[in-house]
Amino acid sequence: MKFLVLAALLTVAAAEGGISPRAVWQFRNMIKCTIPESDPLKDYNDYGCYCGLGGSGTPVDELDKCCQTHDHCYSEAKKLDSCKFLLDNPYTKIYSYSCSGSEITCSSKNKDCQAFICNCDRSAAICFSKAPYNKEHKNLDTKKYC
């Protein structure tokens, strides 16, 4: 059910110009590159205090810290002169990359902002692949624990 809610939110946001489904799909595919058996939209949305929309408090584990770092990376992207986003949103930036085995390479043809966002997503996907997944942190009560 939560997946359907996420899909609906992504569709509405994309229709309003906020989130590009293609950009979200790129990040999803990067995670699939490093963790082929994962289902990123299901596994990592609504995990801990930072994985999913928004984030606050102290990360509950290493994986949640990966999401906090990814959020921070996107915040840094917003400060770059080369990154002027539609509706101030890094999720709209499309970039080029390749996946070979579990190795992600951001294309040298990316412009500065694309390269920055690609590396944010690449670093997060690699971080996810190294962090343990704790099922008890999925759908965490963020009001209580964050």
Curated annotation (Swiss-Prot):
One of its GO terms (biological process) is antimicrobial humoral immune response mediated by antimicrobial peptide. Its EC number is 3.1.1.4. It is found in: Secreted. CDD domains: PLA2c (cd00125). It is an enzyme of class 3 (hydrolase). Keywords: Autocatalytic cleavage, Calcium, Disulfide bond, Hydrolase, Lipid metabolism, Metal-binding, Phospholipid metabolism, Secreted, Signal, Zymogen. GO terms for cellular component: cell surface; extracellular space. Disulfide bonds join 33-99, 49-146, 51-67, 66-127, 73-120, 83-113, 106-118. Its main location: secreted. Residues 16-22 form a propeptide. The keyword Transmembrane does not apply. Secretory calcium-dependent phospholipase A2 that primarily targets dietary phospholipids in the intestinal tract. Hydrolyzes the ester bond of the fatty acyl group attached at sn-2 position of phospholipids (phospholipase A2 activity) with preference for phosphatidylethanolamines and phosphatidylglycerols over phosphatidylcholines. May play a role in the biosynthesis of N-acyl ethanolamines that regulate energy metabolism and inflammation in the intestinal tract. Monomer or homodimer. This is Phospholipase A2. The lineage of its organism: Eukaryota, Metazoa, Chordata, Craniata, Vertebrata. The gene is PLA2G1B.
